[in-house]
Amino acid sequence: MAHPNPASTPAPLYLTGNKDGLRDFLNKFDVFLFDCDGVLWSGDHIFPGTVETLELLRKNGKQVVFVTNNSTKSRADYCKKLQSLGIPSTVEEVFSSSYSASIYISRILDLPKDKKKVFVIGETGIEQELRAENVPFIGGTDPAYRRDIQPQDYKLIAEGDSSMLDSEVGVVLVGLDFHLNYLKLALAFHYIKRGAVFLATNIDSTLPNSGTLFPGAGSMSAPLIMMLGSEPTSLGKPSQAMMDAIEGKFRFDRSRACMVGTGKLGGTLGVLTGVSSKDDFVSGAVRPHAYLDKLSDLLESGL
């Protein structure tokens, strides 16, 4: 999708220290969707004023939703992380890419009755959310798939032998998998070639950790994209599919929802505590509507 010409896009409002501007901005929205890492915390360090800012929003009747592309954790696991950092939260306030994918498969995809099973490349977070939606699956953390491919496997896969390929698989779902191997990729490729829907929890190419970058969930999909010559439907942020799923669950007016983030992918409110600089927000190809030095600057609104 082509990005808008920066010259034709209004410069974002800088709201830090602008009490009236902050109050007017907050009053435009009923729902606040939070990117977490870089907005609420960095690593295991919560930013000062985060809890108080969330309390301010809730006190003023705003709905708070925590949005994450982390597919390795279930919503319950992610809620525990929030609470361990001192952030009050409930499972229903968490919307993860693994949950988004599970909702999409169970409630939106119209799969044939004999093709309801999902082949998973990913970790327990995906499995827990699929299980909660009563979606049958294979692969994932099953030790049977954590092995080298054997010479006889090629012929069995090519022939569609039931010992290698399950005829009931109608979806291949790819997330971050710490045990990705040739066998999993070969099976995923042949399921998709046989008509399975190609989905990804998210397409982030890298995963930040310990001050550097590691392969992300998008890097798990990359070999399949190369083989197939086609892209998966992504169920993570900032995809339209994830926004549709969030809107469907929480039943809000999208024009009254504020997405708070750190990246260069747009959103409503940007903060400078993550990966973006002021120049990115002011001169970048995709700009937020407004930005702050840090999230806790919202406390200056006096609401």
Model segments located where?
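Asp-based, Mg2+/Mn2+-dependent phosphohydrolase catalytic module
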Residues: 2-36, 41-62, 71-95, 102-303
